[in-house]
Amino acid sequence: MTDPRDNLLDSHLVGEGGSNVEPASDPTLYGHVTLDGQTEGIEARSYQTFRLTYTVGRYGLDDTGAIRIAFRAMSDFGRLQMADPTAAGYTTATASNGCRLALTYEPRGHNRPRFKSLTIAVGGGYLREGDTITVVFGDTSKGSPGMAMPTFIDPAFEFKVYADVVATGHFTPVPGTPAVEVRPGPPVVWHAVLSSLRRPGETFLFGVKAEDKWGNPTELAEANLAFETTLPVNGLPSNFAYEKGNRSHAFEGLSVDEEGVLRITVRNADTGEALAESHPMVIRKGAVSGYWGDMHGQSGESIGVTTARHYFDFARNKSFLDATSHQANDFQINNAFWAYLQELAAEYNEPGRFCVLPGYEWSGNTGVGGDRNVFFREEGRQIHRSSHALLTDRSDINTDAPDANILFEKLKDEDVCIYAHVGGRYADINFAHDPKLETAMEIHSAWGTFEWLLTDGFPLGHRSGLVCNSDGHKGRPGASYPGAATFGAYGGLTCFITDELNRDGLFDCLRKRHHYGTTGTRMHLDVRARFNGDTALFDKDPNAWDDAQSAPADSIMMGDIAKVSGDTATVSVEAITQAPIERIEVRNGMDVIHTLRGFDKPDLGARFRVIWSGAEYRGRGRQSEWRGRARFGGSTIKRMSKINAWNLERRLEVSSADTIAFDAMTTGNFGGFDVWLDEDPDGMIEIATNHGTLKVRAGDVGMEDTALDAGGLERRIRIFRLPEDNTCRELSRQVDVPLKPEGDNQLWVCVTTEDGFQAWSSPMFVFRG
């Protein structure tokens, strides 16, 4: 039996504040709504036409009154417009009695969570009971292709109707929200998913799925699959019939007996075609394994889409995560939804298989500390909200924590871990930070990449780990594509290095900072250091804890805090990746001390990589638009490969024999392309953008960046050369890093792979004494 709490339509779980005033006590008197058009099985990002009819109720609809159809804020359906009848999104409306109607579409025209709205105002008359207003979304009568649907699946894409029947400017919901079902399109890519580190004999799962072109797992795929493995895998069949109707399949309870690197190639058993290759998984004896989580996202009960149950199911069964948490904005979490989240966390938490941490997002404005993620070890704890902004129940308002320092004070005796993050309201860690509670900085999400959130803490003496998550709003934790609207990046993941997959293991890992983050890929990353003198390894931060203890150590790992007598660290880095490694930066604080590559200058070919990156500023409007062209004078482009071009509707293409045209967006992350030229060129390269032009002779471009700073927040254009075919997917190096005599040395690495993904290790905090 379906739980009614899993249906978002007009749900009492949705944090959606309204007014306590309205024309009558019975909302059915304001009219009713019907929707005609295809309502089921609509393909994501297809063009559709819908006819919505509002029938006026007993109160009539006054002159200058209006109706409003509102949509979810994070839905990326195509923009509605009334100006061009031949273009997408053309929308019309007519009144049955001939009244004049004025249509206005606004991206922020209504209240959260339904910012996007179409308002239809009556002029030159009024409507009586029984009169109608008919709205055609995607009116194709004059050549429009229709209304572009969202890029992601949505079991209930809502047309929420409100009416201002007495022309007060106050809109009241009309009962009976129409909705349509958006489903995945046909498959275009297969994925094979493994974890990254297991011990011999330890069980793991292997996930297989097919996605449509927008990243939705699709049930339209079918194939006879064959698996090729680099190590013998206990429990994995050699062949598998993947049938239609399934959006994924997980092979559980697998194990490998011998040490090595496991990669699994998925082939079409009938044709031999390679469909996918898995992430690498290292099988190694030791005390720990690597478990992957996306701990930050939300669903339609707050600002996202789909339901909380769908969210947890996707994390476990579609993106094959080991761990997750639901992080709704606190000012939208009513008490019924908070209680339901506790139930779901307990239901889905399965030690050893899938770890769920109960939690929420404390969503204070930046001026009072900015966004924080709160994770509890157990269910049933008190939520301390930043405000009750969208909550009508005020009975527990005295439990609020209106700034981040108050939040830390209220949670000081709780068993919690806290992240700071950058979303709509970026965290100000100078305003508030508690090193006992706030263990990590989230430096990548679907909002972009934000190394500065971590590095801001270096001069303040903070010793925080780093994490990456999706902060996804589209119901796809662990595989969160940005779509075609607000978000600019693929969602991140965190690898927790710990001895057991359960809440205790994750909390221990977070408090030791033994984790690393990626921009969405899975790779094995091991970072350690040893020193030319005595080393004292602390069990916790001695600057925060009076009872911190230290013990002699031969070496330390990512996240550790140590006092050393020597002046040099020998940092060892091991990276084993899915795609070839472009570079690894070894850093001390904000300085890059070494750049490691698996190739050298003689290996370079006529392959150039062009990268644009950065943001406008730190806040919500951080999107940087990149429009322009790159011309490779005197050469012919043999082929071009896109990098992080997530929005399929933005231009990135070969526009002539020697030119690439682009229209892109970054939000602190990077995008770009590789180009292979017909010969080793020596002509002039010109990359002209709306933020500046970079000119350089091709012969002067090497494997180091040639860059142009372009204002904004770390905004720049770069070009460098790569080998024609870089095959380095495993890189192990040791390098010496001089230690500063005073203060912390924050030793960490950043790995960049050729497919556009990055990974960062939590810093090792080393001081001399």
Enumerate the predicted regions with their spans.
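Ser/Thr/Pro/Gly-rich, low-complexity intrinsically disordered stalk/linker tracts of secreted
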Residues: 1-189
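Short, solvent-exposed loop/linker segments at the N-terminal edge
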Residues: 40-47, 60-61, 196-202, 558-566
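Core sequence-specific DNA-binding domains of diverse transcription factors
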Residues: 42, 48-51, 91-92, 114, ...
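Aromatic/hydrophobic beta-strand junction motif of beta-rich domains
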Residues: 52-58, 137, 206-210, 570-577
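C-terminal functional module detector
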Residues: 193-197, 213, 217, 224, ...
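A metal-dependent hydrolase metal-coordination microenvironment
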Residues: 259-262, 275-276, 280-409, 756-765
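Histidine/acidic residue-rich metal-binding segments in metalloenzymes
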Residues: 260, 339-346, 392-436, 451-463
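Structural recognition of the beta-strand scaffold that forms the well-ordered cores
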Residues: 291-294, 322-327, 355-359, 373-375, ...
